[in-house]
Amino acid sequence: MDDDDDFLYGTEEPAVKRARVEPEGAEDDEEPHSQTTKQQEPEDDSDSEYESDDSDIDIVIDTGAPSKLASTASAAAKKEAPAASSAAPEASDTPKEESASEERPQPAAKMPGIDIEKVGMLDGKPITEHNLEDFEDKPWRMPGADITDYFNYGFDEFTWMAYCDKQNQIRGEYNPQNMMAMMGMSMMGMPGMPGGGQMPMPGGEGMPDMFKMMQGMNPPK
């Protein structure tokens, strides 16, 4: 049985014999090689440890960097927020001043006034002295004409003519020259004072000049 095994699988004796036959120098050469291999094995272990350490450091850096960035970003945002809040009132003050200046009422421009007491003029002549019968066309008599385009204050052709006649009559009656003539005639008919003099007014002054006084009077309208 052993012979069959030896035939099939071989024996270890030839290998032992070869090991014995090998020279001593070869064994010496192999021993340093084995030692170097043995010495290199720890280095490989150290390299693997370094690699594992490096991998651990990489993991720590990757996980820690976002938190640091987030913390720095939040700190920067907090610093910028007060600056923006402090700058906001300065920006809001300027529009208030502008709005205050815009709301100030501007002084109204003085418009030229109209003298309502002055009589209107037409062709260099007071309008009250014009006779409506002297107009040839008389446009206010045309069919469809608006009387208010030619007469104001409810006047028409006939009431306007009556008003003008009355105004001319009043002005004629209150003419200063006519008034002085009438007053002179009335004074001439009065009896003379004793001593041929006029009665002095209080204060020793005579009667003022009636002509000047009448000139200062405005005729009624």
From Swiss-Prot:
GO cellular component: nucleus
Localization (cell): Nucleus
Main location: nucleus
One GO-annotated biological process of the protein: mRNA processing
Source taxon at top rank: Eukaryota
Keyword Nucleus: yes
Annotated InterPro entries: Fip1_dom, Pre-mRNA_3'-end_processing_reg
Compositional bias per record (Basic and acidic residues), positions renumbered to this chain: 14-23, 93-105
Region listing for Disordered, in residue ranges: 1-114
Segments of skewed composition (Acidic residues): 42-59
UniProt KW Magnesium keyword: no
Keywords tagged on the record: mRNA processing, Nucleus
UniProt feature, compositional bias: Low complexity: 60-92
Role this protein plays: Pre-mRNA polyadenylation factor that directly interacts with poly(A) polymerase.
Membership in a protein family: Belongs to the FIP1 family.
The protein's name in its UniProt record: Pre-mRNA polyadenylation factor FIP1
Organism, scientific name: Yarrowia lipolytica (strain CLIB 122 / E 150)
Source lineage: Eukaryota, Fungi, Dikarya, Ascomycota, Saccharomycotina
Gene (name only): FIP1
